[in-house]
């Protein structure tokens, strides 16, 4: 008779951008319970600057990490001594924030005598559909976030094959830029989505980059430029933008992003050898995008709950749990990494990693 999988309790820590997070997760990898997930947002700290300021973010992480860990422990109803291992985002991201998290995790691991597991932040997002929907490997993932956009064949807890990605800006960075151009608050993704609800997505014709080229690569830099020119043309012609102008621009932009990602997803799916299709990352919270992607295939489709799309520590704890079950642990030489590709064998993307707060 086969023994039941061991139940483990993992503390996860996340601090790669502008959210400080801690979570407690328990179970074997195929039967997980999230006991707590605490996220402290820095949105108000960065609002006046129109984007994330790395120095402010790093300082806020250092001041907040202890508090979110304490709250996660209290919510889960456990003590630090009950934790079996500590998983922490070790990259990629803003180096000051990543370093704050890694140092905090090292201190806890050393003081408690617990194993330490460094987690690739992108792996946390990539494995979220398995956490929430139990997808079987291999599945196709569209990882779409503030600093990244790539198609990955997820073959195992630490095995990822990149099929394509953005050659310049990530969609999340493009949403933020469009929001700034239109005077909408940050973060730009939710602001653009809200404004688009009252907009006409057919009013303005915007380019759909790289659809004339084969493959799964994407580009969003030219789309941002097109929105800038559209805005400037309306301002010059009418002396300013009306609320309807803003709504229509947002709706048109959002529709183009969704249609481009949907078409590129069809191409990635045509490569075959996957059991399901999933989307993850912060931009995956966009409902128009989710609806467009769900229509591209008859395979099972997974889009995690909104709270697990944006940055959080539960997905880091889960990735750490799977790595720990696979026998990987790190020691006190674990370093913070500003860049950390999931598919280390793939050639670097043109322009990859140069734009966005989390690049």
Curated annotation (Swiss-Prot):
<feature type="binding site">
    <location>
        <position position="286"/>
    </location>
    <ligand>
        <name>substrate</name>
    </ligand>
</feature>
<keyword id="KW-0819">tRNA processing</keyword>
<feature type="binding site">
    <location>
        <begin position="143"/>
        <end position="147"/>
    </location>
    <ligand>
        <name>substrate</name>
    </ligand>
</feature>
<keyword id="KW-0479">Metal-binding</keyword>
<keyword id="KW-0963">Cytoplasm</keyword>
<dbReference type="InterPro" id="IPR043129">
    <property type="entry name" value="ATPase_NBD"/>
</dbReference>
<dbReference type="InterPro" id="IPR022450">
    <property type="entry name" value="TsaD"/>
</dbReference>
<dbReference type="GO" id="GO:0061711">
    <property type="term" value="F:N(6)-L-threonylcarbamoyladenine synthase activity"/>
</dbReference>
<feature type="binding site">
    <location>
        <position position="121"/>
    </location>
    <ligand>
        <name>Fe cation</name>
    </ligand>
</feature>
<dbReference type="InterPro" id="IPR000905">
    <property type="entry name" value="Gcp-like_dom"/>
</dbReference>
<dbReference type="InterPro" id="IPR017861">
    <property type="entry name" value="KAE1/TsaD"/>
</dbReference>
<dbReference type="GO" id="GO:0005737">
    <property type="term" value="C:cytoplasm"/>
</dbReference>
<comment type="function">
    <text>Required for the formation of a threonylcarbamoyl group on adenosine at position 37 (t(6)A37) in tRNAs that read codons beginning with adenine. Is involved in the transfer of the threonylcarbamoyl moiety of threonylcarbamoyl-AMP (TC-AMP) to the N6 group of A37, together with TsaE and TsaB. TsaD likely plays a direct catalytic role in this reaction.</text>
</comment>
<comment type="similarity">
    <text>Belongs to the KAE1 / TsaD family.</text>
</comment>
<dbReference type="GO" id="GO:0002949">
    <property type="term" value="P:tRNA threonylcarbamoyladenosine modification"/>
</dbReference>
<dbReference type="GO" id="GO:0005506">
    <property type="term" value="F:iron ion binding"/>
</dbReference>
<dbReference type="InterPro" id="IPR017860">
    <property type="entry name" value="Peptidase_M22_CS"/>
</dbReference>
<keyword id="KW-0808">Transferase</keyword>
<keyword id="KW-0012">Acyltransferase</keyword>
<feature type="binding site">
    <location>
        <position position="176"/>
    </location>
    <ligand>
        <name>substrate</name>
    </ligand>
</feature>
<keyword id="KW-0408">Iron</keyword>
<feature type="binding site">
    <location>
        <position position="125"/>
    </location>
    <ligand>
        <name>Fe cation</name>
    </ligand>
</feature>
<protein>
    <recommendedName>
        <fullName>tRNA N6-adenosine threonylcarbamoyltransferase</fullName>
        <ecNumber>2.3.1.234</ecNumber>
    </recommendedName>
</protein>
<feature type="binding site">
    <location>
        <position position="311"/>
    </location>
    <ligand>
        <name>Fe cation</name>
    </ligand>
</feature>
<feature type="binding site">
    <location>
        <position position="189"/>
    </location>
    <ligand>
        <name>substrate</name>
    </ligand>
</feature>
<dbReference type="Pfam" id="PF00814">
    <property type="entry name" value="TsaD"/>
</dbReference>
């Amino acid at each position: 008779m086969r023994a039941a999988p061991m139940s483990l309790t993992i503390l996860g820590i996340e601090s790669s951008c502008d959210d400080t997070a801690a979570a407690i997760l328990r179970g074997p990898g195929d039967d997980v319970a999230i006991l707590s997930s605490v996220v402290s947002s820095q949105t108000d700290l960065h609002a006046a600057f129109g984007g994330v300021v790395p120095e402010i973010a790093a300082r806020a992480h250092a001041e907040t990490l202890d508090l979110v860990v304490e709250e996660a422990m209290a919510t889960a109803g456990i003590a630090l001594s009950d934790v079996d291992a500590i998983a922490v985002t070790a990259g990629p991201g803003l180096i000051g924030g990543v370093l704050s998290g890694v140092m905090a995790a090292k201190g806890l691991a050393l003081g408690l005598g617990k194993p330490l597991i460094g987690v690739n932040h992108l792996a946390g997002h990539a494995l979220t559909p398995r956490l929430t929907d139990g997808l079987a490997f291999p599945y196709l993932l569209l990882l779409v976030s503030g600093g990244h956009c790539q198609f990955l064949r997820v073959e195992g807890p630490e095995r990822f094959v990149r099929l394509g990605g953005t050659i310049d800006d990530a969609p999340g960075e493009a949403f933020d830029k469009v929001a700034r151009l239109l005077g909408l608050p940050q973060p730009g993704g939710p602001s653009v989505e809200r404004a688009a609800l009252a907009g006409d997505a057919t009013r303005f014709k915007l380019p759909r980059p790289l659809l004339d080229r084969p493959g799964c690569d994407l580009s969003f830099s030219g789309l941002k430029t097109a929105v800038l020119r559209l805005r400037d043309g309306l301002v010059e012609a009418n002396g300013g933008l009306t609320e309807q102008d803003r709504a229509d621009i947002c709706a048109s932009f959002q529709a183009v992003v969704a249609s481009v990602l949907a078409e590129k997803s069809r191409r990635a799916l045509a490569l075959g050898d996957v059991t399901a299709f999933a989307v993850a990352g912060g931009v995956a919270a966009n409902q128009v995008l989710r609806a467009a992607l769900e229509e591209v295939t008859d395979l099972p489709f997974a889009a995690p709950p909104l709270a697990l799309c944006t940055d959080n520590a539960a997905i880091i704890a889960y990735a750490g749990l799977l790595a720990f079950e696979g026998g990987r642990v790190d020691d006190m030489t674990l370093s913070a990494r500003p860049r950390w590709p999931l598919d280390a064998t793939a050639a670097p993307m043109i322009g990859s990693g140069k734009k966005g707060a989390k690049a």
